[in-house]
Amino acid sequence: MARRGSCSTICLNEKLQRFRIVRISDKADNFNSRSGSFFERSISLVLLLWCFLFLVYSKLGQSHDDYGNADRIGNYTDGSVSKTLNSTSSVFPQATEKENNFCLLRKGQLQDVYEHVLVNNALLICKVVLPERRISKKTLEARDPRYVNLEDKSLKVNGSSQLVNNGTRYRLEPDGNGYNYASAMKGAKVVDHNKEAKGASNVLGKDHDKYLRNPCSVSDKYVVIELAEETLVDTVRIANFEHYSSNPKEFSLSGSLSFPSDMWTPAGSFAAANVKQIQSFRLPEPKWLRYLKLNLVSHYGSEFYCTLSVVEVFGIDALEQMLEDLFVPSETPPSKPAMVELKTADEKQDGEIKSNRTDQIGKETEAQKKKDDVVKTINIIGDKKYEVKEKHNVLKVMMQKVKLIEMNLSLLEDSVKKMNDKQPEVSLEMKKTLVLVEKSKADIREITEWKGKMEKELRDLELWKTLVASRVESLARGNSALRLDVEKIVKEQANLESKELGVLLISLFFVVLATIRLVSTRLWAFLGMSITDKARSLWPDSGWVMILLSSSIMIFIHLLS
């Protein structure tokens, strides 16, 4: 973009210079036709004015850039034009360094005018020659999708597969991302790892918070990944996003078509950078692999744990490559770049200015064509060799798959025969099963009806339960009231009993007293002792008898109650 901007700026300056020259020539012709005699009579005055204007414009030109000077085109003279050319060559040194002889002494249309003024002084007219346009590798990569870098964004293009410089096609997802054959979602899995490793299957997932963890002190750290399919592996990407751990430094890759395997085919040794981001590593030569073994040789830093978050494998499987060869054949080798010709309208208008360099450019073009033909021949030969080898590998893999399919087909036929032999028994079993199913359906219907009845009875029971509960609550309230009445009666009964006991004691006392009196009277009478009349009048016997009788009756009533 910078070179294109410089070329456009040089073309603009060249246009401005030609416009100034033409305008100055027109003014000079008109001025010469109308006032030629005036110049002849006052050459000294014109020379002084010319020197003064040259000094003034030279001072002004140092304080303004090309765009500021372009606003005053009508006020420029030939000295300012040469000054502008000098400033242009200082701003664009690449154009002046490559073309050292682009300034020519040429007599133009202004020669006649200046001969009248400066006495046959030749005009130094500078021609700005556009630099040769060289197409860089980045430009070709931007214009031709076959040139793709193996960085993180190298696998994001449109289409089902993508060509790279060595002719390998990458299988892509529908969204344009690379098809990861080491993804757990595609069917890949970890089949083996060292015994100290923890979370080995985490490298196949998308959760960066989970990772493979190994103590850094372990010497043999490895993990064996079974890819989703037998793949022509071309690129492997790894990453470690765990901050408090050591990053992998040197690691090696090896592969095999079967597992377990005693012979692992080396795929390459690589050195990773000490960064917390995904890094891409391209195999020196793509290899057909089903099992990929990753050996972690060394690490950065001195942390206790060495972790690994992501392992991704990109390439193309045999079926995908065959489909690409059948339906999307490449017309040109992927390593042969297309030569881009850059032609603009300004170059067509400047054909007369470049006429002096036509022969030289033609010679360089012929030499470049010869060189390109040699490179093209070498690339075509290399691509044909690689294509033949690649097709041989694809054919080998397809033959292995065909043999495997034949073996599976024979096993399938045996299993079908066994199933046909067992079909009558299976039919009987199916009939029995159908009978049992019908019986079960009838039982289920009966159970459903019984369930409905039970639910109805349960509802009735719930109603009865609520009724009984209300009655029990009323009985409980009556019982509490009755208990209070009983307590009152018990208290009254205790009072009555205490009173009865007092009456009984008093009655017993009087009974004893009356008995003693009557007995003593009879003893005195028996012993002949006389009782005076006065004493009998004071204590008559009939009174004591009444006291004894009443007290006895009270005691008898109390005992009966």
Swiss-Prot record:
Keywords: Coiled coil, Membrane, Transmembrane, Transmembrane helix. The keyword Glycoprotein does not apply. Residues 345-367 are annotated as: Disordered. Residues 454-499 form a coiled coil. It is a multi-pass membrane protein. Disruption phenotype: No visible phenotype. Embryo lethal when associated with disruption mutants SUN3 and SUN4. Its main location: membrane. InterPro entries: Galactose-bd-like_sf (IPR008979), Suco/Slp1-like (IPR045120), SUN_dom (IPR012919). One of its GO terms (biological process) is nucleus organization. Pfam families: Sad1_UNC. Residues 158-318 form the SUN domain. It comes from the Eukaryota. Disulfide bonds: none annotated. The chain crosses the membrane at residues 36-56, 501-521, 540-560. GO terms for cellular component: membrane. It is found in: Membrane. Forms homomers. Interacts with SUN3 and TIK. Encodes a member of the mid-SUN subfamily of SUN-domain proteins. It is involved in early seed development and nuclear morphology. [TAIR]. This is SUN domain-containing protein 5. It comes from Arabidopsis thaliana (Mouse-ear cress). The gene is SUN5.
